[in-house]
Amino acid sequence: MSNTAGQVIRCRAAVAWEAGKPLVIEEVEVAPPQANEVRIKILFTSLCHTDVYFWEAKGQNPLFPRIYGHEAGGIVESVGEGVTDLKAGDHVLPVFTGECKDCAHCKSEESNMCDLLRINTDRGVMLSDGKSRFSIKGKPIYHFVGTSTFSEYTVVHVGCLAKINPSAPLDKVCLLSCGISTGLGATLNVAKPKKGSTVAVFGLGAVGLAAAEGARLSGASRIIGVDLHSDRFEEAKKFGVTEFVNPKAHEKPVQEVIAELTNRGVDRSIECTGSTEAMISAFECVHDGWGVAVLVGVPHKDAVFKTHPVNFLNERTLKGTFFGNYKTRTDIPSVVEKYMNKELELEKFITHKVPFSEINKAFEYMLKGEGLRCIIRMEE
């Protein structure tokens, strides 16, 4: 165990005091881990659109002050009672959803939606005692999705930590703890395109490009990128995208455009925008008889869409996925190995790097739509 085990650690954290206001670097106190918890030192973290969405708090229950962040890589500092599969010094990726290994979902090979540790954006405290491990002068600071990686130290449930190869560079593989794995797994684990097949990807942000990367790894012969922003098309070529369709450039529905391009439809489609209009297009653009559409993007909670039942009766399949169907502890270490084996390229997702003291720049980049992922280096 480390020499700080069992003690309160004082460190820097980027605290969101209110919705939409710049984060403030504060000295926080991080309590020791309790039963089934692990305290980790964060070395690198990244900003995901989910952090920005809840920081803006335009459509959700606002919970402040809060420490955001959930794409990161770090090293175990100490473990709480009952933790046997991690020890101080282990390299880990904290993940917003977990794997308890005991519930029906964890025991099923088909599901990764753990009953105990499934994502909960409203909970700002730890499961074991309903309390926060962060405080400033005695005032609790709320957690975010069980990870809160915008802090030099954080406390995470053991089931939400993937133990990874210590040789893997944390400034690269930290991206695998959320968006990249979500898109990659949607293709590899759910859509499962065969070699030589045609794939359409709706939305060419980081998640969509990761889905395209999955299609590239699968040996797809054609990967059609669909996006309303034509300036994304050139960048997408690096991820295997071979053709581009901007729905605004056509009078007819984009699913009809794709059907004409592909002799009645693509074999697989992956929808990564959360737009219900795009969801309909993604489903209706797959080929009858064998086409599979996979929904990844998260819509507004009240959103609904409709399509004709004949689309199903003609043997098109519509699926949804959560975190690319990856189990946090069981599967993510092998995704890291894909990077280590040079199958998966992560460098091309990284468009910006900033020190922790300039974390608000990462928010500016994302709000302006500049780049894909910004790596935040915790040590100055």
Swiss-Prot record:
InterPro entries: ADH-like_C, ADH-like_N, ADH_Zn_CS, GroES-like_sf, NAD(P)-bd_dom_sf. It is found in: Cytoplasm. GO terms for molecular function: alcohol dehydrogenase (NAD+) activity; S-(hydroxymethyl)glutathione dehydrogenase [NAD(P)+] activity; zinc ion binding. Binds 2 Zn(2+) ions per subunit. It is an enzyme of class 1 (oxidoreductase). Zn(2+) 1 binds at C48, T50, H70, C178. An alcohol binds at T50, H70. It catalyses: a primary alcohol + NAD(+) = an aldehyde + NADH + H(+); a secondary alcohol + NAD(+) = a ketone + NADH + H(+). Its main location: cytoplasm. Pfam families: ADH_N (PF08240), ADH_zinc_N (PF00107). GO terms for biological process: formaldehyde catabolic process. Coiled coil: none annotated. NAD(+) binds at residues 50, 203-208, 227, 232, 273, 296-298, 323, 373. Its cofactor is Zn(2+). GO terms for cellular component: cytosol. Zn(2+) 2 binds at C100, C103, C106, C114. Keywords: Cytoplasm, Metal-binding, NAD, Oxidoreductase, Zinc. Its EC number is 1.1.1.1. It comes from the Eukaryota. Homodimer. PANTHER family: ALCOHOL DEHYDROGENASE, ALCOHOL DEHYDROGENASE 2. Belongs to the zinc-containing alcohol dehydrogenase family. This is Alcohol dehydrogenase. It comes from Malus domestica (Apple). The lineage of its organism: Eukaryota, Viridiplantae, Streptophyta, Embryophyta, Tracheophyta.
